[in-house]
Each structure stands twice: as structure tokens, then as C-alpha cells.
Amino acid sequence: MSNEIELLQKQVSELQDLVKKQSLIISKTGERVLELQLDKQKHDVTDFDSKFSKSISKKSGSATQFDATDFATNEDLVELVKELQGELNFIEERSIRRLVNSLKKDDDDVIAPLPNADGDIPAISDGVFPKSLKEFKDIPDLKLVRLAKFYERLPPTLKEQEDFENFLEGKVEAFHINETTDEEISKELEKFSKDELDDAFNDVARYLGLSLRRGTEIW
């Protein structure tokens, strides 16, 4: 028992170190993006000063026309920082929850739901996200596909692509992949082989940080 506890403590320590390294890399990436944005801002200002000086030296009586929208405003930079911070928060939240899920071993252990790419967290109350390790292990195919779609572990169908394009073109006000009906998923399930469903199960398990796998010799 003591050896198992020591092993778990070692795994927790290694995972914590990994999360710290990932957070540092993400933070450095965000700083670099801001540096590039500021460098561009400085370059644009210098370029404008040069054009303005040439215009004055020619004594043309009017300054060269320029488009003020080419320059990033303080509001743009603030918004960029907010977006980057939001992404960092989601990534950190996913890392923490994956760390928690990686330690789940017993059937009754509760699974922590992770945010998807849009930052949405599935509600356990709606019955789609499994409450425990056993529920995930025995998840029905329909719920598995719905969960895989939520986490973008499956490619979109033609209809989903069309719906998303309509959303981008402003033809519909909102687009949510989880609005696919059970009937639509049931029809889609007919095209899946057992191996494809096993792959979907394993992909979702990896995303959630769970050690469960279907099949043999699967990492």
C-alpha cells in the first residue's frame, strides 16, 4: 500500500511540474504575441511620420492622406490581452481537470468535466457527460458520439459544416454542435464501425485525461 501511495505522489508531482511548464510556455507565447503587435504599431507610427515629413517638405499645403484604421488602438491591445488571458485561463482549467481525472481509478470516482475549445463545460445534469468512471466505461454509443462532437474529437458531418457556414455568413444567429438531435446521431451511428467507435472513445478519454482505453496496445 505504501508503495502505491508513493507512486501516486510521484505521479502527482510529475504532472504538477508538467502543468507549470505548459503554463510558462503559454505565458511566454502570449508575451511574444503582444511584442509582435507592439512592434507593428511602432513600425506603422514610424512609417506615418516619414510620410508626413515628406509631405511637409514638399510644401504641398496638405498632409498626405492616411487610413487611421491601419493603426491598432489602445482598446485593440486591451481586447487582445483579454482574449489571451481568457485562453490561458481555459488552458489552465483544462490542465487542472486533466490532472484530477488522471488520478481516477475506482468505478465510483467522479469525473471532472473539461471545457471544450469554446470554453463551454458540459452539465452533468443533462445526462450526456458521465458522472463516474464506470459510467464513462459503459457509455452508450449515442452519448459517446455526442460527447466526442462536443469536444471536437470527430470530424463534422456535411450538415454540420453547412450549418457552420450559414452561421459565418450571418444566415443563422447561433451555431451549437450539441444541438444535433438524437435521431440525427442515430443515423450517423449506422456509418460507424466498432473500431471507429473505439477510436472515438479513446480520443475522448485522452482529452479528459482518463486512463481508460478500448482495444489492445493502445497508448
UniProtKB/Swiss-Prot annotation:
Q: Which GO terms describe its cellular component?
A: cytoplasm
* Localization terms from the record: Cytoplasm
Q: Where is the PTM Phosphoserine found along the chain? A: S23
Q: Does the keyword Lipoprotein apply?
A: no
Q: What is its main location?
A: cytoplasm
**This protein's record includes keyword Cytoplasm:** yes
Cross-link Glycyl lysine isopeptide (Lys-Gly) (interchain with G-Cter in SUMO) lies at: K137
Keyword annotations for this protein, in alphabetical order, are: Cytoplasm, Isopeptide bond, Phosphoprotein, Ubl conjugation
Return the Pfam families for the record: DUF3294
A further note on this protein reads:
Present with 1550 molecules/cell in log phase SD medium.
What is the name attached to this protein's record?
Uncharacterized protein MRP8
From what organism does this protein derive? Saccharomyces cerevisiae (strain ATCC 204508 / S288c) (Baker's yeast)
What are the leading ranks of the lineage?
Eukaryota, Fungi, Dikarya, Ascomycota, Saccharomycotina
